[in-house]
Amino acid sequence: MNTSTNFESFRLQALIEGFDEALEREWPPLTLLDMHTHPFAAKAVVTRGEMWLTVGDLTRQLRPGDTFEIERDVPHAERYGAEGATYWVARRKD
């Protein structure tokens, strides 16, 4: 998955990989999401802006072209940069 593909290509690849859905998420500038979980696994690629993803003691800065994966029910926090961020995300509800 990379940003040189279009969203439809991302969505089709996600379905081939066994994900249930794919969508584009857009976050406003300086949004902060405290530690939380999701009832689904996620695989995403950042397409605009920047964000920081914290899992446990590790925080990663993510920019366009960077990818991340997180399993269901894993506690994590998200912080979005001064321009906000957009990413394409595939979700698997298992």
Where are these regions (language model features)?
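Short strand-coil-strand connectors
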Residues: 54-58, 81
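Short, conserved beta-strand element in jelly-roll/cupin
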Residues: 37-53
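Short acidic-glycine-tyrosine-enriched beta hairpin
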Residues: 57-72
